[in-house]
């Protein structure tokens, strides 16, 4: 499991409660292990003094990038477009992101599941939104004519951004070239507890904790306004289902 997080030894990577493997490293439950913390310094913040550098909010694999995201999109039988009104559940600030940029990435059950702020700024709105559990897009997962598609659940992550339980965190970035941006934590399958650990009015530095997923695999979204010009760094990968994790707090984009 530790290899998913970028290493070979859990005791070297994580702030374990005990080094005794027979005592399960001191974890008292699956969720206690699932929400484990990295040791200080294991995931340094990319360019902490450069507000033009955006950090990866989760230890996650790039899934999809979308530009000129529409306010409202139809859900077709094939394909899953993003729809801001549905993703943000018609939040009063939804229109601010019309025509903007959306980045989505996937966290497997073995990933590190705490969220970290991609930018320095002020938390201006944060709340949880109820949604479905085990939601699915029935048109996805039939690409293999001989057997069920084993990654069907991963394939309709875009659909889940508008249907699953999620946490919305709006940040007014210190960098005026970024301004208002939004982090959306999306529960997948049975993930029904997106825990927000910041409060409205709080200032966070890039890399500070925002919250965490509980219990299972998840996905997340970074949303930017159309005025923000970004150069994304996928670390040599093309977003999709076959990507590997980019470390949390590593550089994920640069503001032009």
Residue ranges and their predicted role:
Residues 1-256:
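Contiguous, well-folded functional domains in the mature portion of proteins
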């Amino acid at each position: 499991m530790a290899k998913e997080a970028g290493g070979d030894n859990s005791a070297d990577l994580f702030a374990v409660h005990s080094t005794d493997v027979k005592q399960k490293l001191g974890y008292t439950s699956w969720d206690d292990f699932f929400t484990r913390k990295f040791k200080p310094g294991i995931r340094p913040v990319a360019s902490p003094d450069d507000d033009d550098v955006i950090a990866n909010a989760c230890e996650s694999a790039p899934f999809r990038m979308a530009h000129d995201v529409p306010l409202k999109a139809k859900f077709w039988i094939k394909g899953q477009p993003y729809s801001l009104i549905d993703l943000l559940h018609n939040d009063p600030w939804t229109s601010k992101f019309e025509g903007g940029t959306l980045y989505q990435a996937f966290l497997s059950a073995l990933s590190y599941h705490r969220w970290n702020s991609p930018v320095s700024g002020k938390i201006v709105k944060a709340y949880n939104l109820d949604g479905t559990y085990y939601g699915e897009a029935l048109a996805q997962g039939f690409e293999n004519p001989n057997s069920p598609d084993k990654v069907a659940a991963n394939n309709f992550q875009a659909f889940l951004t508008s249907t699953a339980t999620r946490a919305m965190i709006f940040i007014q970035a210190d960098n005026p070239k970024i301004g208002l941006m939004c982090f959306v934590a999306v529960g997948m399958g049975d993930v029904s507890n997106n825990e927000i650990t910041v409060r409205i009015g709080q200032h966070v530095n890039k890399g500070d904790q925002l919250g965490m997923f509980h219990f299972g695999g998840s996905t997340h979204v970074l949303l930017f306004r159309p005025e923000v010009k970004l150069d994304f760094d996928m670390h040599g990968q093309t977003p999709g289902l076959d990507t590997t994790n980019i470390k949390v707090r590593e550089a994920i984009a640069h503001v032009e």
